[in-house]
Curated annotation (Swiss-Prot):
A Pfam entry, by short name: Ribosomal_S14
Protein role: Binds 16S rRNA, required for the assembly of 30S particles and may also be responsible for determining the conformation of the 16S rRNA at the A site.
SUPFAM superfamilies in the record: Glucocorticoid receptor-like (DNA-binding domain)
Quaternary structure and interacting proteins, as annotated: Part of the 30S ribosomal subunit. Contacts proteins S3 and S10.
Protein name listed in UniProt: Small ribosomal subunit protein uS14
Top-rank taxon: Bacteria
Length: 101
C-alpha cells in the first residue's frame, strides 16, 4: 500500500487541477488563437506560467482508490489489478466473471 502522504498529495493535486481547469483552458485558447495579437498571446503565456505547477493535469497519476497503487490500475473501475481481482472474485462487480476459453 502506498504511503498516506503520497495518496494525499495526489488528491491535493486533483483538487488544484479542478480549481484552475477553466482558467487554464481560457489561457490556452488565447495562446493558440492566431487571430489574437502577439502581445495578448504573450501576456496569456506569462499568466499561464504564473499558475501553480500542480494545476497542470500532466502531474496527475492514476491510482487505485483502495490501496493507492500507482501501476496496474484499471481506469474504468479506479482499482488496481489485485483489488479488482479480489472484488470481482467475491462477486461485488455486477456482470464481471472470470475469463474462460
Amino acid at each position: 500500500m502506498a504511503k498516506v502522504a503520497v495518496i494525499n498529495r495526489d488528491l491535493k493535486r486533483r483538487k488544484i487541477v479542478k480549481k484552475f481547469e477553466a482558467r487554464r483552458a481560457e489561457l490556452l485558447a488565447t495562446i493558440n488563437d492566431a487571430s489574437v495579437s502577439d502581445e495578448d498571446r504573450h501576456s496569456a503565456r506569462i499568466k499561464l506560467q504564473m499558475l501553480p505547477r500542480n494545476a497542470s493535469p500532466v502531474r496527475l497519476r492514476n491510482r487505485c482508490s483502495l490501496t493507492g497503487r500507482p501501476r496496474g490500475v484499471y481506469s474504468k473501475f479506479g482499482l488496481g489489478r489485485g483489488k479488482l481481482r479480489d472484488i470481482a472474485m467475491s462477486g461485488e462487480i455486477p456482470g464481471m466473471i472470470k475469463a474462460s476459453w
